[in-house]
Amino acid sequence: LRPDHANRRRRRAGAERPGRVPPARPYSIDDDTDFLPAVKRSIRGWKIAYSPDLDVFPVDPQVSRVIDAQVKAFEEEGAHVEEVKVGIRRPQQELSDLWCRLIIPRNITGLDAAKAGGVDLLGEHHQDFPAEYLRWIAVGQHLSAVDFYKDQEIRTEIYDAIQSVLNDYDLLVTPTLACLPVDNANDGNTVGPSEINGEQVDPLIGWCLTYPLNFTGHPAASIPAGLSEEGLPVGMQIIGR
């Protein structure tokens, strides 16, 4: 944690004040925490869990080598690092589908609001949307309330798995991404790989080890961990309570 990160976090934290537009969100917390002391806080004696793959993600060997080496930095600072099984049992392809199902209704309502305001994005600019996005819009149009509640049950499973680790450890560390960076597409629709280590992944999101934390709400930060053999950046995700 750097001082600029700590200052930014302090300014963004806390409840929104009455009279602000938009109005205060009901789940915000009025907590004036000073994060600057954490910059110099020791981690000596901390227990840190290390999951190379959140149990279910295929990870590029170059990514694994960098993260395996860099977790030793925690030990050099006096922490105790243990490799763990998180307990996630759902296949990663099922989890990436879950993320898309959960995020697409908000997209649909946003598109509907724009249309009500006189801007029909799907009607007037249909050809400008990626095919993957249009496919999920179509799926989202047919989701039911029962589907929604079934998906919430899966979210609970993921939360319980992550929290069970953090009940015994101070932090959980993983790779940020399962793959190395990809080239930007010429058509503006850059996606990730469709396969890692011979296993199919969703090119939209299936190579990210970050989105399961969208299910759980645990605080998480990604930091630079090193470079691949080709000099490409590799990130490390640090998950807290």
Where are these regions (language model features)?
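A short helix-breaking turn/cap at a secondary-structure junction
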Residues: L1-V71, E77, G117-G118
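Short, surface-exposed loop/helix-turn segments at secondary-structure junctions
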Residues: Y27-D31, W99-R101, K150, V182-W207
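Short helix-loop capping/hinge segments that flank enzyme active sites or metal/cofactor-binding pockets
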Residues: P37-S51, L102-Q163, C179, N184-N186, ...
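Acyltransferase
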Residues: P61-G87, L111-L122, F148-Y169
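Small-aliphatic-rich amphipathic alpha-helix that forms the alpha element of a beta-alpha
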Residues: Q163, Q200-I223
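Short, well-ordered beta-strand elements
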Residues: L232-R241
